[in-house]
Amino acid sequence: MNELSIAYGLLKDLQHESEKHGVSRVSRVHVRIGRLCTIVPEVLTFAFETASEGTVAEGAELSIAVVPARGRCDKCNIDFDVETDTSVFFCPQCGGVAAEVISGRELEIALFRGTSETTS
């Protein structure tokens, strides 16, 4: 299950960022995942819930935005949506092979919210 290792990676990043910003409890995490990453959002959500037990993010709400796959043609210089069921992306205008994938490979924590403990 690739999603479980991704969940552990996200939790490692959350732990680091929480310590850096004085956050003791993460309540919400928003993740951006590119369509080309072949991650199943529901499986990642389950993996995150399981892996987060006993961590700063235990019980946190995970929301996932899937970023569309887009390519850029170096001949026409246009951006276009690409099909994710193929490994070669063709320009819809000239038929050329897309020289660059400009979105769809993202895997990032876009934001997280949490609270910090205060001592009296």
PLM regions: where:
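Long, charged N-terminal interaction/targeting segments
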Residues: 1-63
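Long, charge-rich boundary regions
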Residues: 2-4, 105-120
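Short loop/turn motifs enriched for small/polar and acidic residues
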Residues: 32-36, 65-69, 110-112
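Short Cys/His-rich "knuckle" micro-motifs
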Residues: 83-86, 101-105
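Short, flexible, mixed-charge glycine/proline-rich loop motifs
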Residues: 61-68, 80-85
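Cys/His-rich microdomains that often coordinate metals
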Residues: 79-80, 98
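Cys/His-enriched microdomains
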Residues: 71, 89, 107
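Short cysteine-rich clusters marking metal-coordination/redox-active sites
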Residues: 73-76, 91-94
